[in-house]
């Protein structure tokens, strides 16, 4: 039907319906599921720009430098930089438990942050507003991890902190995501791809430099950190447990329905699959999506819809119990009660 007046919602909902996703999950057997994963993961890596980065940096080995150390009582907080690209010294924090519950290699948890200050995930705040945001939203995620007895890596998300533009640093803007997006697009890359690349290089480094149990690697972060958690686990199968918070939803019901930061977007993603299809690349590894009942930007009804689709992937994989949705009673924030019991359960299984 031809409309007499333009309506932006109707127009784009029509486009979404016509996207005809190539990798919409339809497998009924284990063999078909594995073939779907292999083909989709390869295509997703290409779309994110990971293949371009890998080709441009073939043979490159990142160097690391420690720049600080502080005793925090029950753990040690170290500051590091890792040259994830020759032109990108990426800051990150390493938190080490002083009294781990077991001897030998330790589990590793990566805690990518979202649209906030990188230091908040390690419990640092500089203003009363930051303190309240950290405490109410349970955003000291790396500290939570190290207090579970795990090694924790809290990287700066690309386009934040020291990886902002000079102008954004001078103006004390939180991020430079738009600059990252538009310049990445010129060379076939994406901010999500950059951030997934960084996570994989941190895992490379940790496995060589730290006493890490390679079978017990988890990733969890809130909002934009949930984005990185989901896509990194979809692309890098070394990540054994994925717990994205305040992100898992449908693309059409969240970033396709309201204003979101440009760093969330991957060109043509709906022609490949919905968010639950991307998350399906994590199966059979344990996956728990944390959501807020009152989250205004990743609405719970669309999170539940996405979860119903994702459960089907885990059913075909033969492990439906490994796919969970935890719903907190608040808004867009982290809910630690949805994270650590789930992580512990599967870390314990992996050593039993």
Language model: regions and residue ranges:
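N-terminal targeting or regulatory segments adjacent to alpha/beta-hydrolase or S9 domains
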Residues: 1-76, 84, 352
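Glycine-rich active-site/cofactor-binding loop and its immediate structural neighborhood
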Residues: 67-130
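Cap/lid segment of the alpha/beta-hydrolase catalytic domain
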Residues: 104, 110-208, 253-258
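Mobile cap/lid helix-loop segments that gate and shape the active-site cleft of serine hydrolases
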Residues: 179, 183-186, 201, 239-280, ...
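Alpha/beta-hydrolase fold nucleophile elbow
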Residues: 211-223
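Glycine-rich nucleophile elbow surrounding the catalytic serine of serine-hydrolase chemistry
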Residues: 221-231
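Short beta-strand/loop motif that positions the catalytic acidic residue
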Residues: 282, 289-291
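C-terminal catalytic histidine-bearing segment of alpha/beta-hydrolase fold enzymes
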Residues: 308-352
């Amino acid at each position: 039907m031809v409309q007499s007046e333009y309506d932006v919602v109707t127009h784009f909902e029509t486009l979404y319906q016509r996207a005809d996703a190539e990798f919409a999950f339809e497998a009924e057997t284990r063999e078909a599921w594995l073939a779907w994963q292999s083909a989709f993961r390869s295509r997703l890596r290409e779309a994110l720009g990971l293949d371009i980065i890998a080709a441009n940096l073939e043979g490159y080995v990142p160097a690391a430098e420690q720049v600080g150390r502080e005793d925090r009582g029950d753990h040690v907080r170290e500051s590091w930089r890792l040259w994830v690209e020759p032109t990108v010294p990426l800051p990150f924090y390493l938190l080490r438990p002083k009294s781990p519950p077991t001897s030998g290699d330790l589990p590793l948890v990566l805690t990518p942050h979202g649209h906030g200050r990188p230091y908040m995930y390690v419990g640092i705040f500089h203003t009363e507003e930051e303190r309240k945001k950290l405490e109410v939203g349970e955003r000291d995620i790396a500290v939570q991890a190290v207090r579970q007895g795990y090694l924790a890596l809290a990287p700066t998300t690309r386009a934040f902190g020291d990886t902002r533009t000079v102008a954004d640093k001078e103006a004390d803007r939180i991020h430079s995501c738009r600059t990252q997006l538009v310049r990445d697009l010129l060379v076939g890359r994406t901010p999500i791809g950059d951030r997934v690349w960084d996570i994989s290089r941190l895992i490379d480094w940790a496995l060589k430099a730290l006493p890490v149990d390679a079978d017990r690697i988890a990733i969890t972060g809130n909002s934009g950190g949930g984005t990185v958690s989901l896509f990194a686990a979809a692309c890098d199968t070394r990540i054994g447990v994925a717990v994205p918070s305040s992100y898992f939803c449908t693309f059409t019901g969240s970033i396709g329905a309201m204003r979101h930061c440009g760093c969330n977007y991957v060109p043509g993603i709906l022609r490949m699959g919905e968010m639950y299809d991307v998350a399906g690349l994590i199966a059979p590894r344990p996956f728990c999506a944390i959501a807020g009942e009152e989250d205004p930007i990743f609405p719970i009804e669309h999170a539940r819809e996405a979860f119903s689709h994702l459960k089907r992937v885990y059913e075909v994989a033969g492990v439906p119990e490994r796919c969970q949705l935890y719903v907190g009673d608040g808004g867009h924030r982290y809910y630690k009660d949805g994270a650590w019991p789930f992580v512990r359960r599967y870390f314990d299984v992996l050593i039993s």
